[in-house]
Amino acid sequence: ELDIKSEASLDATSNLSSADVDKLLTGAYKSIMEPSSYSYFNIMASEIMADNYKPVKFQWYQVQYLHEHIVPEDDILLSYYYKDFYTAITRANTILRVPSATNAQKGKARYVRALSHLRLYDLFERIPLIDETYVKGPIAPSSGKDVLAFIIEDLKYAKANIEKFNVANASLVQLTPTSEAATALLARVYRMNGDIQSAGKEAEELITSGKFSISDNPKVNTSEVILKFAGNLAEANGTWGWIMSYDAKT
């Protein structure tokens, strides 16, 4: 039997270099962008159900189900919506268990966890809350209020610990969570939770920061972007970017 230390795998229960933790974060971001092989459904489902998108052509009957709010219980895509968002949550929890992870890295992991729980909340409301202390086994779903409270705590930590948005390097820092990204999502979740005063406070903080502004040209909207997870062009065309494009209607 060979006792050779792996040169490729990472043991998240041991101290890791900052660069190695960043690699784990990249995996978490990847699972946000592409929760499953049907990620266009994952990402667009709640938007279609909320009537934020007006479909031009139903290429999949599941999209029509979403738009008409008649998704049957045995729709196979429900399993993708439900379980695959937990991939990002699991990866975030792995990072939170790394002893050497910095507070900023933990903040980014908690942002990922918050966003994934929020996507699940948008679709199902009552969901199991999975944190870094979870061990395998059955877990009951939490109430909608408890889910939002959990998300808020994650985002408050993320806001307090992730680096601030650096306008001088905007095109790069837009690609990963920043303190301002947590602030923006926190405003949304406070609003969903009925806390209008706190939502307004977070939103006003972003507006008055002077770091973001409405662009006159929608094709050049860098000044508007707070956070934009981005992979390569092949991922964009092959997953959910194409279905929202002009070409999709043909």
Walk through the language-model features, giving the residues of each.
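Hydrophobic-face positions in mid-chain alpha helices that act as interaction patches
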Residues: 45, 53, 60-64, 200-250
